[in-house]
Amino acid sequence: MQISVVWTINARTASVDRAIENLAEIAEEGFTRVWCTQMPNEPDALTMLTVAGWEVPEIEFGTSVLPMQVQHPMLLAQRALTTNAVIGPRLHLGLGLSHQVVTEGMWGVSYKKPIQRTNEYLDGLLPLLRGEKVNSGGDLITTRGSLTMDDIDVPPVYLAALGPKMLGIAGSRTSGTVTWMTGPKTLRDHIVPTLRAAAVGAGRAESDVRTVAMLPVSVTDNVDGARAAAGEQFAMYNNLPSYKAMLDREGFTGPADAAIIGDESTVAEQIRQLGEFGVDEFVGILFDRDAEVRARTRALLRTLHP
């Protein structure tokens, strides 16, 4: 199982120069991939990772996740291929539907028919990434045309899929799923088998799809303090239906329970267990604000990285 970390590009807490310095430090420590979140009020992840990837050539990038509703498939294909044209074949393109409170409340875009929207989006995006011409006239999304962007490596596409229908799309059409706030039992009993079954049902191999599990992590002796901090920082996810469903399915009382917290042996055992349950890549979000705790956490993750 690959071990990665989230690369923070929040402009409120770090300048662009400092973000790039932080990325270089992560690469020097031996990590081979970072994942970038995309919040609706933060810097554009693709732009940031393209600039940073030019400066730091030793590391790959994943996006977790770019919202589909605010960019047409042709625009996203242009942006993703441009990124790989600049930094080489290092982009892993994670997409998602965001959340109703964001799409309708902030953007004024309907959240209705999410499964149909996802399929129609991929009908346009995937062929364009492969350099093919598209003629897709959907009820929600129409994509017609082609790009003049040849000889550029095609980025693997992942979906933020948690429910069975979205996992079916991810398994049959993409490189896999990126999960968040999803515990070990749910990964073992729901996410991994549903994704792999969809791949096989589409005539693919189970190994053609990957489960990327993103969770908060902290190596610390102050377990209660870290758990309280996680509960405070990630409280909003208890109010988002897709994540609340995963927390409830696991039997968690809230987002704090999803965090992996403890000393080195405790955290290492929980992360290794994810690999035994079929997770292909663990992505740690280092949420503790104490620099020593963050360094200790990254030091452990380095020992787990193959």
Residue ranges and their predicted role:
Residues 1-306:
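Active-site-adjacent structural elements that line small-molecule/cofactor binding pockets in enzymes
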